[in-house]
Amino acid sequence: MSVDSFTSRLAVVMTAVVLVWWAQALPVPSPRRGESDCDAACRKFLLQYGYLDLGEENCTEVDSNRKLCSVDDELVGVPRPLARVDLAAGVSHLQTMAGLEPTGRIDASTARLFTSPRCGVPDVSKYIVAAGRRRRTRRESVIVCTTRWTTTKSNSNETLVKWWLDQSSMQWLNSTLNWVSLTNVLHHSFWKWSKESMLAFQQVSLERDAQIVVRFENGSHGDGWDFDGPGNVLAHAFQPGQSLGGDIHLDAAEPWTIYDIDGHDGNSILHVVLHEIGHALGLEHSRDPTSIMYAWYTPFKYDLGPEDVSAVAGLYGAKPASSVAAWNPKIQKFYWDRHVRNDLLPLLERDLDAEEEDSDEVR
């Protein structure tokens, strides 16, 4: 090979290397309006959770709160009303809601949102039974609806909310949880909301006396918001109102456990119920990952965050520390002794200590 030929080839190679380096150094261009790498699964997700409206030509109205839209020959239930937005804007909005950088493009973190376990309540739009305007809390993370429960206890200024657990629905459970353990999970979760607000909760023995009905459901169960089996949608709830208002539905097909200590024990029903009660009280999803109202399931989270406390207190009023109701320690001790693994007891002892301190303050 001649020197000139070698020199020419070397120049070509060096030029190619420089061009590759230059291309890699260039910033990734932002998507133009309406442009996105959003595939069918992405579009279905954006529709289902309120980030995108395909337009009336692709949808059939079911009622004033819901319509069915066709996505690649599959019908998807979509909340109404929705803003008409393009795909890139919808993806950016989703990323903002999940606490990610709003690039409008589908990266690995964004793609995981489509399959990660989460609440079935839409992130955008007025949800089903809810009526009235929405407002954000001071730090603009948790959305609070003006729809709320208004029944007041006769001997205090607390708002009394009655709840009922459908024991018969537990026959479909894919779990070892029983009625005693679940009842105590519910008592414990309602207590956490009541100690931060002027709310009082009472379990009742008849469904007709309850504002909040808690039950397990499978697949299509008559409310238009179907469950999808294990994974993805874990539960949904309806905001305060008549008929289904305030009701909490849990997917019976999920591998429910009480505490999910390592992210592999199953889905923590304590975490999910605490989240869904927030919806039943009038709160919507938060973009703050530390909030119990964050839409995606987060192991190890069993308490309200600062945003949650501010939101529920803003809706129902803050409860003075001296009037916080204490948990019944006998019921709770029995519950934990029988239904919690030994390696989870430290978490529960922390909660017990907090509740006993509240009890001492009341006395």
Swiss-Prot record:
Catalytic center at which residues?
276
Swiss-Prot/TrEMBL keywords: Hydrolase, Metal-binding, Metalloprotease, Protease, Secreted, Signal, Zinc, Zymogen
| EC number annotated for this UniProt entry | 3.4.24.-
User: Where is it located?
Assistant: Secreted
Motif Cysteine switch location, chain numbering: 117-124
Q: What is this protein called?
A: Probable matrix metalloproteinase 095L
- Key word ATP-binding present: no
Gene Ontology CC terms, in alphabetical order: extracellular region
Propeptide regions on this chain: 26-126
One GO molecular function term of this record is: zinc ion binding
